[in-house]
Amino acid sequence: MDRVSTAHLRWAYPWKTLLQSGVVVAGGSDAPIETCCPFTGMHDAILRQSRDDEEDIFRPEERVDFAEALWMYTIGAAYAANSEHFLGQVYHEYTHVWYVLDCVVTLL
């Protein structure tokens, strides 16, 4: 966060505040600058820890829980892409993309 002034840091990544205000928040990445792995983004939204120091938590009041992070990266992302009527949920009329994982996602 060295590139952002202290005055502006309070507005950085306010996920919890936005969700509580009724804003549709879309999870995503800035690939190729950041990883395109949604689990990394979800992990960061949930824990908000520094990659260098796990004790350094950026604005802990803006943490989201697992369900909120999953919502951001599924339904929220589909909404942002104007595709919420056929993506983002497991529903018989929706387009499905399935991933098989070899771990418990809630532990990521």
Where are these regions (language model features)?
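His/Asp/Glu-enriched, well-ordered alpha-helical/loop segment
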Residues: 1-104
